[in-house]
Amino acid sequence: MPKKAALDELKWKEVKLPDHLDDFDGFMGLEEIEGVDIKYQPKGAMKEVIYELPEVHEKKDKKPEKRKKDQKEASEKKKKGKRTSPTIEMTSLGSKVTSKNYNEFSTLEEEDEHNSHGVDVSAWAHFSLSPEMLGSLSKAGFSKPMPIQSLVIPEASIGFDIIGKADTGSGKTLAFGIPILEHCLRNVDAKYVQALVVAPTRELAHQICQHFELIKPSPNIRVMSITGGLAVQKQQRLLNKHPHVVVATPGRLWSVINENNLTGNFKKIKCLVLDEADRLLQKSHFEELSKLLEILGNPMHTQRQTFIFSATFDEGLQQRLKKNMKGNITEKYNSPMENMLKEVRFFGKPKFLDANPQSAVASRVLEGLIECAPAEKDLYLYYLIMRYPGKTMVFANGIEDIKRITPFLNELKVPSYPLHAQLDQKKRLQSLEKFKNNPKGVLVCTDVAARGIDIPSVTHVIHYHVPHTADMYVHRSGRTARANEDGVSILMCGPKELSQLKRLCYRLKKKIETFINFPVDMSILDILKTRVVLAHKIVNLTRKDGRVGREEAWLKSMAQELGVESSDDEDPDLPKKSESSKNKKQIAHLRSELAPLLHEKIRTGFSGRYLTSGLVNMAEKLANEEVHDNIIGMDSISALEVLQKRKK
């Protein structure tokens, strides 16, 4: 008789995805199963799906010859002395070896190998971390704690609830990750979820998972993510295997646990983390977050510890939090953040920890200002990219600006990639992947890229427009100077944006004078003008031609649906078509003018005939290999060095 089985009980096999594909449009995995019959059984007015496994017959005993051959192969393997791995039982103080086949010298070999690849972690010693955690930090290359980690870990180890203000890229994931993983190490045999981390985006959730996997002190600690991109059924199965840490987005987590009554899995959690809390307060997340907080219940029953992190907090709220929330939060303060803090229900009075109290922007970010007319912003942008090449993120306020700036830079042979809300997931991932892999790439984006995306080694952030809010300026600038690196944030401001800049400075508690006026070489700007004018003409004609093409395609599709013959097919000499062909000829002509200019190196400060004459001794620079990549006659200096010199 075939055996009935639930969908979650079937033995699913993971399908290995091809390596040659660049991305999977946000698709995270695929599983398959064989030998299962699907039948439909009437159940009232509906039909119930039944999964049946075929009857399993016992296999006949192997032939004597085959059995002897297998025994011979097994004995040969035994003679070779293949070492078996020891079984390790984790305890709160360290590792206890329980295997009979354990070789004590193998530990020394592993230790030597570990030390040869790890870094010195003596700077972490005063945190009283377990040897396993110190070993993981050493192997991962974290030689010393960052400021937010130094503030959070001691307080979290005692058991305090934490409200942390930390810049993006400041190391806050490890600040809450280390205490959580230490707790999981002490309770590695627990059969329920120990910690829940809630993040606003799928990308951020997977980054947090990667960090946890990187530093987890024991392979027995299981970390799983619940986000879009994986089948709900698979996530439910994984959740039933009792992972220690769950990292999730609010919407998907709510749908997974609510549909199959898995809310009980989270009622005993010991740690709750709300990362990038300001973004979790958006309408798209807040409803599900409120429901999740209601399910978690009263922390007094489970002694649950709570961590809330954000890069920005309202000034008045900060003052009240610094007073340990004296008198609690009342109805007269009704900001979204405070309403959420009321819903969270802390175990005790939370500690407010600010890693950068002096400034909202990370201390390693140097901020520059370029004042220019709106019509000249493209010219100044091209100048910055040519003069200071490096991985650059350009933030604009509108999607139409992204659609114009990206092809403009591409016409100038600058590798540029768009990122905005109207792009589908596949194209977003393609742009991000190309940008990450190009050390001189430019990501032209709206504020969707300001949070939740960890892109290493971003050298410059350029604000093409003054951002609408101070919070967004902080998040944009936080894309650079991540993980103890230095970075540059340059704000381009037009005359009409001056009042907006003043409001921004007021919110950030700084004067406009604190922005360093970024120097611009006007002689190079004049040389680049011709290129920029030609590129503008090409882009304008291309976009105009594209609009005409889209209109024609729409009219044709409408005519086909109505069963009417298209008038375009009858008359090939329509004005639109002749205009389109004229535009194409103009574009080809303009590109032929631009090509030799782009091929030619920019020269400044010296004579082409006499290398030692003029303001720059070019012969000496060539001999000393002090030549700029794009501009002959200029020193190869970074934008960071320029701002550092002007700051002194």
From Swiss-Prot:
InterPro entries: DEAD/DEAH_box_helicase_dom (IPR011545), DEAD_box_RNA_helicase (IPR050079), Helicase_ATP-bd (IPR014001), Helicase_C-like (IPR001650), P-loop_NTPase (IPR027417), RNA-helicase_DEAD-box_CS (IPR000629), RNA_helicase_DEAD_Q_motif (IPR014014). Its EC number is 3.6.4.13. SMART domains: DEXDc, HELICc. ATP binds at A166, D167, T168, G169, S170, G171, K172, T173. GO terms for cellular component: nucleolus; nucleus. GO terms for biological process: ribosome biogenesis; rRNA processing. PROSITE patterns: DEAD_ATP_HELICASE, HELICASE_ATP_BIND_1, HELICASE_CTER, Q_MOTIF. The keyword ATP-binding applies. Keywords: ATP-binding, Helicase, Hydrolase, Nucleotide-binding, Nucleus, Phosphoprotein, Ribosome biogenesis, RNA-binding, rRNA processing. Transmembrane segments: none annotated. The keyword Phosphoprotein applies. It is found in: Nucleus, Nucleolus. GO terms for molecular function: ATP binding; ATP hydrolysis activity; RNA binding; RNA helicase activity. Its main location: nucleus. The modification Phosphoserine is found at S85, S566, S567. Residues 52-89, 561-586 are annotated as: Disordered. ATP-binding RNA helicase involved in the biogenesis of 60S ribosomal subunits and is required for the normal formation of 25S and 5.8S rRNAs. This is ATP-dependent RNA helicase mak5. It comes from Schizosaccharomyces pombe (strain 972 / ATCC 24843) (Fission yeast).
